[in-house]
Structure formats: C-alpha cells, structure tokens
C-alpha cells in the first residue's frame, strides 16, 4: 500500500470507510477525547474534526485506532503482513553472512532495497508554505487538545521530535509529549535513555552553555511516525526505513533556523532550541496507565519559528487506560517484534504484549524448551535485547503447547507448572518507566519473571504430571455421531 504523505493516506482511509469527518463544532477541551475514546473502544474509524471550537484548523484523532490502520500506515494490507516487516528488520539488524554465491545473490534485493532509500532533500517544501517567526509565533493558534479534567495544560501528543547529537551524522526521531507552557514555549518530556535526551546530554557536554537545536514535526506521514517507534537498526535512519515502508524515498527539507531536516510534507513544524538549564515542572497528565502521573521537571523547548502547510491539519491523540492508541499500536507492532526476537532467540515460538498491560509492561513468551533453566535465559534476553522492553516489568515464559495470546492457557500454565518460590525471578533496582508510580523510586524499580514451563529433572526431584488427553479413536467415534446426538440446537457448536 503506497502513499506519499498524511493527506494522501487520509484519502485512502476515506475511500475504505476508515475515516469519519465530523462537521459539528467540537471542543478540543475534553470533548474530543470523549468522542475519540468511545470511537476507539468500538473499533471505529479515524476522526477528522473539521470545526474545532475556537479554531480554524481541523484536528485528526484515532489515526492508529485499529491494528489494521497501523498496518496500513506501515504499507501493509493486513496485520499479519507485519511479520515480514519484522523479518526485514531482523535481517538488517544482524545480517547472516552469505553461505555461498547463490545465497549472496538471494540477499542482494534486500540490500538494494535499503540502498535505494536514502532521503531526498528539497530546496522548498509544503511544510514551509506559511511561516511565523519572532513575535508572530503563537502556539495558541493550534487546537492542541486538553485531554483530561485534571491535566495541567493542553498537551502536544504526536510531536515527531528531531534532534542530532554533536558527534553524530544521523538524526534521531522520537515521539515525546510536550506541555504547552506559553505562546512560544513547551516542556519536552523525554526520558533520560531516549535518543533525544541522549543527544541533548551529549550536546551539553560538548557545547557548554550553547543552545541545543530542536525541531518538532506535527502531522508527519504515518510511515515516518511509525518508524520513530520501531526498533530500527542503528545503521539505518528512521527516514530511510519510512521510505521502505511507504514505497518511496522520504523527502525532507532543512529547517529555516537550523540544519535539522524535517519531513517535507509535515502539516506543521515547530523550530527552536533548548536553553541549557532551563527546566519546568511538567504535569500532571492522564497517561496510558489510566492514572494521572506525578509532576517532574523537564527541559523547556523555546519555539522561534512555526512553519506549516496551507490549510494545515493538526494530528493529535489522547492516552488513557487501555485500549488507547499506544495500546493498539503495541498490538500491531507486536508482530514486528516477533521475528526480531526469534532471530536472536530461535527457540521463541511466540511473543505477546497484552494491551491490558499498558503496551509493554507485561510480556508472555512461549518457547521450545531445550534445557533446565532455559526459561530464565529467555527472561533475561527479553529485558536486555531491545530498548523497547527495558521497562517491561513482568515476563511470563511458557512452553510451546500454550497459546501466548489466550489467558485461559497462560493462567492454566502459571497455576499448574509454577512453584512461587522456585519459579519466580525478582530483580531489584532496574530501569522503570518514570510514569510507573508503583515503583519505590521514580525511574528505578524491580522486575519479575515467571517460569510457567514444564520442569525438567534438574529443576525438580518430583515426577512431573502428564497432561490429560482423550484417546483419538474415541474422539473420532464421537465426532461421527455428534450431530445425531443433538445435544445443542446450534449445529455450529464446537466439537
């Protein structure tokens, strides 16, 4: 599925009945959240609020409100096809050496695909059709949503933040929420291990006292947004990967006030800087946990320029108790993660992040167990292999006869194959999401691994139970007479 920018993607959604235009005046203060939340929970379409109260700019919500639309944003027609995206990433992350000339020939298309996707830098771009700078900069022109009653202020939620470290050629793209602080100021809430925060830290060390350039793209195309939250190999830029997803090179343009490159088709771009040492208290905000988070200090982003397309669209979302857009995206991106994990740990059969677990806080893994202690090795691997799982608090490991996506199966395995003392792994003082108020210290907490696999002789001296299973000949005989028994009126009742 190919598209060029957000508007092109919205046209495709509308053709397929996946976009609903709302012409009634709707308030960005709370009302949009309530409508978007009800729509998402019902599996409904993306929403384009054409007449936000008090504004002349339409607001787009629920763009990634179903796993299918996430897949479409990644250039695929179906969620199952995201496994192929994961396989490509796994290959690029750690290419296998060719086993011979024929194998090398077979691998060439993958390398050619990547080499053909560098960015294309334009001299002018749609995102700079209109420009405000200096005293004309006013964030109140943008219909930024105020999502929950006790939120501190309106919150920019889909800001694609572009930074570059002082010793890096490659830019970093990250999605960080930003509290509106004034007409030209926002609070940049990035966690210390995120790419933007690391770039800023390195800048402060290399250039003490100098302003750190930042750009934020609002309304970038879906492929670029999704590339920013996907485990792209360090050797591949998010822009190049976005080009692979959408089927053509990512077009960028240099900012007017600095050398950062932003998506040329973005609806709105905020340019500016962070003054070293300028911090402000951020929050509280209703978050993806379903709770308001505590207040903490983060850097202040000063906006010097606002550039935008004519008739710009503001792309927004809300976060709350699952399901919300992050949870839905987690379900879809789960399919991308599986091949990447299997590349490193071939014994993994399936990997599942239940949306009820706030996108990433709990993982269920099924494996082909090969030796005593195998489950514990897999736990450690999940926590350490991808940055996306460093905040996963609970990892449940089961055998491959268990369906990782069926809680009936998983709970049965936990309650019948686990001893709480022997099969529970607790690790203290590990990195934890700052938003996790249950941890004893902000940003630092514990992790739990549950080994719900069948135990091997080295793991228990007791004889292990054998699963109950009906004789296959008896099942076949009953199958043959089942309909005649007419026990249920519904003939489609499962046998």
Swiss-Prot record:
SUPFAM superfamilies from the entry? FMN-binding split barrel, UbiD C-terminal domain-like
Q: Which InterPro entries match?
A: UbiD, UbiD-like_C, UbiD-like_N, UbiD_bacteria, UbiD_Rift_dom
Required co-factors: prenylated FMN; Mn(2+)
Please tell me where Mn(2+) binds in this chain: 172, 238
Provide the residue positions that the database annotates as binding prenylated FMN: 175-177, 189-191, 194-195
Q: In which pathway does it act?
A: Cofactor biosynthesis; ubiquinone biosynthesis
Q: Which domain of life is it from?
A: Bacteria
Q: What is this protein called?
A: 3-octaprenyl-4-hydroxybenzoate carboxy-lyase
Source organism of this protein record: Yersinia enterocolitica serotype O:8 / biotype 1B (strain NCTC 13174 / 8081)
Lineage, please? Bacteria, Pseudomonadati, Pseudomonadota, Gammaproteobacteria, Enterobacterales
Gene responsible for this protein? ubiD
């Amino acid at each position: 599925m190919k598209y060029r920018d957000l508007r092109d993607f919205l046209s495709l959604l509308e053709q397929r009945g996946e976009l609903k235009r709302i012409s009634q005046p709707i308030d960005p203060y709370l009302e949009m959240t309530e409508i978007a939340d009800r729509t998402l929970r019902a599996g409904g379409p993306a929403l384009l609020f054409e007449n936000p109260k008090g504004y002349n700019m339409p607001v787009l919500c629920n763009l990634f409100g179903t796993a299918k639309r996430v897949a479409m944003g990644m250039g695929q027609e179906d969620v199952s096809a995201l496994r192929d995206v994961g396989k490509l990433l796994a290959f690029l992350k750690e290419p296998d050496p060719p086993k011979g000339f024929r194998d090398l020939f077979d691998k060439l298309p993958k390398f050619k695909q990547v080499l053909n996707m560098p960015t294309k830098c334009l001299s002018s771009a749609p995102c700079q059709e209109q420009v405000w700078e200096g005293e004309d900069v006013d964030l109140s022109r943008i219909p930024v949503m105020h999502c929950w009653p006790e939120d501190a202020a309106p919150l920019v939620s889909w800001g694609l933040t572009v930074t570059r470290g002082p010793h890096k050629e490659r830019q970093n793209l990250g999605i960080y929420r930003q509290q509106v602080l004034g007409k030209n100021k926002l609070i940049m809430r990035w966690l210390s291990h995120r790419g933007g925060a690391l770039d800023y830290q390195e800048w402060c060390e290399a250039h003490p006292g100098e302003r750190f350039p930042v750009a934020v793209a609002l309304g970038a195309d879906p492929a670029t947004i999704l590339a920013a939250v996907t485990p792209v190999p360090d050797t591949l830029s998010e822009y190049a990967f976005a080009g692979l997803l959408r089927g053509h090179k990512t077009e960028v343009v240099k900012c007017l006030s600095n050398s950062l490159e932003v998506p040329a088709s973005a609806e709105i771009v905020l340019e500016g800087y962070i003054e070293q040492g300028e911090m402000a208290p951020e929050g509280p905000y209703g978050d993806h946990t379903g709770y308001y988070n505590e207040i903490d200090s983060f850097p202040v982003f000063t906006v010097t320029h606002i550039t935008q397309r004519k008739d710009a669209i503001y792309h927004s979302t809300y976060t709350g108790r699952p399901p919300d857009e992050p949870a839905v995206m987690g379900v879809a991106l789960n399919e991308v993660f599986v091949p990447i994990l299997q590349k490193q740990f071939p014994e993994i059969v399936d990997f599942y992040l239940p949306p009820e677990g706030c996108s990433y806080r709990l993982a269920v893994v099924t494996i082909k167990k090969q030796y005593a202690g195998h489950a514990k090795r897999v736990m450690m691997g999940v926590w350490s292999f991808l940055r996306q799982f460093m905040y996963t608090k609970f990892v449940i490991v089961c055998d491959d006869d268990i369906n990782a996506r069926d809680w009936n199966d998983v709970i049965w395995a936990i309650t019948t194959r686990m001893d709480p003392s022997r099969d529970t792994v607790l690790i203290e003082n590990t990195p934890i999401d700052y938003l996790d108020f249950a941890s004893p210290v902000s940003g630092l907490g514990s992790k739990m691994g549950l080994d719900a696999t069948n135990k091997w002789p080295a793991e228990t001296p007791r004889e292990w139970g054998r699963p109950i299973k009906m004789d296959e000949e008896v099942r076949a005989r009953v199958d043959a007479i089942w309909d005649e028994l007419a026990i249920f009126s519904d003939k489609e009742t499962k046998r």
